[in-house]
Amino acid sequence: MTDQSHQCVIIGIAGASASGKSLIASTLYRELREQVGDEHIGVIPEDSYYKDQSHLSMEERVKTNYDHPNAMDHSLLFQHLQALKRGSAIELPVYSYVEHTRMQETVRVEPKKVIILEGILLLTDARLREEMNFSIFVDTPLDICLMRRIKRDVNERGRSMDSVMAQYQKTVRPMFLQFIEPSKQYADIIVPCGGKNRIAIDILKAKISQFFE
């Protein structure tokens, strides 16, 4: 990586759906922001880069396999990471879990010293891995992930338990075994026990803090 004053550091956090990725990312962001300030660190969720499906009917949208790499616009994410590294702002897409598509509005993200990426499929794409300074895989047992996913999708995303279970059996678990779990081999750090692993979070904080020196 070129040593430039505006050059941002990219940290990837991957793992199964509901493994604790977002909790680790938000904890690192919150605690490091208190140390260095909001202008120096940010979080980008891979979910924002689900492909636009506005041209499809709602019936077609709900049939999309959202756990397959083809559901993601990784090309746009790759372009945005390169732009941030050049010191340019990006327009972050906004994805609606209710409408199952990308919204028209975007959120402007300014370059930061450290950007934390989090998402299930980040490590499946070699282009994204090349942009990361280091990567983390959150290794949580699938039965725990399923319980968390049911609670989250029913309470926060308006899903029925039957629909969550059907999706899990049809796509979530098979795609985890086919794509996500094998991508663990590319991680620099593997974190067991999900987002409440305080020892792992403290180690990651110490590692990331080095980039602010």
Swiss-Prot record:
Keywords noted in UniProt: ATP-binding, Cytoplasm, Kinase, Nucleotide-binding, Transferase
Subcellular location: Cytoplasm
One GO molecular-function entry: ATP binding
InterPro entries per UniProt: P-loop_NTPase, PRK/URK, Uridine_kinase, Uridine_kinase-like
Signal sequence, start to end: none
EC number(s) reported in the record: 2.7.1.48
Disulfide bridge map: none
CDD domains: UMPK
Gene3D superfamilies xrefs: P-loop containing nucleotide triphosphate hydrolases
Spans through the membrane: none
Catalytic activity from the UniProt record: uridine + ATP = UMP + ADP + H(+); cytidine + ATP = CMP + ADP + H(+)
Pathway listed: Pyrimidine metabolism; CTP biosynthesis via salvage pathway; CTP from cytidine: step 1/3; Pyrimidine metabolism; UMP biosynthesis via salvage pathway; UMP from uridine: step 1/1
Binding-site positions, ATP: G15, A16, S17, A18, S19, G20, K21, S22
Cellular component GO terms held in the UniProt record: cytoplasm
Pfam families in the record: PRK (PF00485)
One biological process term in Gene Ontology: UMP salvage
Class of this enzyme: transferase
Family per record: Belongs to the uridine kinase family.
Protein's recorded name: Uridine kinase
Species per Swiss-Prot/TrEMBL record: Salmonella paratyphi A (strain AKU_12601)
The encoding gene: udk
